[in-house]
Amino acid sequence: MSETATWQPSASIPNLLKRAAIMAEIRRFFADRGVLEVETPCMSQATVTDIHLFPFETRFVGPGHSQGINLYLMTSPEYHMKRLLAAGCGPVFQLCRSFRNEEMGRHHNPEFTMLEWYRPHYDMYRLMNEVDDLLQQVLDCQPAESLSYQQAFLRHLEIDPLSADKTQLREAAAKLDLSNIADTEEDRDTLLQLLFTMGVEPHIGKEKPTFIYHFPASQASLAQISTEDHRVAERFEVYYKGIELANGFHELTDAREQQQRFEQDNRKRAARGLPQQPIDQNLLDALAAGLPDCSGVALGVDRLVMLALGAESLADVIAFTVDRA
């Protein structure tokens, strides 16, 4: 959109009408499949420990809390939705605001709309198929292709990400003229992410959506480790036309293992000079009480709408981006 007074919306009114139609289409998709729409809090007393996520923090002062308590805007509704699953709600979805205190640009806004849903008794592959169904319906695109993380690296970088050591990863980075970053990086997963971002992403999802699945176990986050290959996690991401659209897991249900991962994240944070984050005990208690075997996925709605409309930037499909908020 051309430069206008900042009181005006960044997106055109016709685009906002099309966005509303897509939101309605998403709701029909899940209603037709018997998936319950839910609403969960935008704030929590705990937050994510992932070293790559940066939440907004605020402080509540009120009756019973005269000294104030810290609250965090949710980076995704995942933890609350899993508590609903543990309480027996069955399959659920949510369209909600999420917040990340990170970059802004063509594909990023600190406040954004997330579509997240969970399917009890679905494995990773069955959920991938459902994501594919939704993308075909909203984007009118071809059926997606799928590549394992290992296959993607071998095809585009000629290196095995599951066995390569840091020296080999740095050599691969040098071929991409990334030595200035890679040579001083000691974290193997950061090196892998650098190679994936610069050496794999530009080549996938050009003509049709591409699922990348079986990420390294060290990048499992809240996903289960594969029982068939302990080197990989039951995790997938979806890419289309240069954009990461979604991130999904066959969800970890073991409370003790999840706590260990949170604690490991905080140790990594401390080593990098980042603040350690409060662990969500309510989530751990829900896992201990019994999270059903399930798979879940988070999808960026603003990016989906941008692709559906052939727009150049999130600003073309969001009423007011942060610089106009």
Curated annotation (Swiss-Prot):
Function text: With EpmB is involved in the beta-lysylation step of the post-translational modification of translation elongation factor P (EF-P) on 'Lys-34'. Catalyzes the ATP-dependent activation of (R)-beta-lysine produced by EpmB, forming a lysyl-adenylate, from which the beta-lysyl moiety is then transferred to the epsilon-amino group of EF-P 'Lys-34'.
Keywords carried by this UniProt record: ATP-binding, Ligase, Nucleotide-binding
Assembly description: Homodimer.
Gene Ontology cellular-component terms listed: cytosol
Family indicated by similarity: Belongs to the class-II aminoacyl-tRNA synthetase family. EpmA subfamily.
Catalytic reactions of this protein: D-beta-lysine + L-lysyl-[protein] + ATP = N(6)-((3R)-3,6-diaminohexanoyl)-L-lysyl-[protein] + AMP + diphosphate + H(+)
InterPro entries for this protein: Aa-tRNA-synt_II (IPR004364), aa-tRNA-synth_II (IPR006195), aa-tRNA-synth_II/BPL/LPL (IPR045864), EpmA (IPR004525), Lys-tRNA-synth_II_C (IPR018149)
One Gene Ontology term from the biological process aspect of the record: lysyl-tRNA aminoacylation
Tree of life domain: Bacteria
Protein name in UniProt: Elongation factor P--(R)-beta-lysine ligase
Annotated binding of substrate, by residue: S76, P77, E78, Y118, E251
The protein's Enzyme Commission number: 6.3.2.-
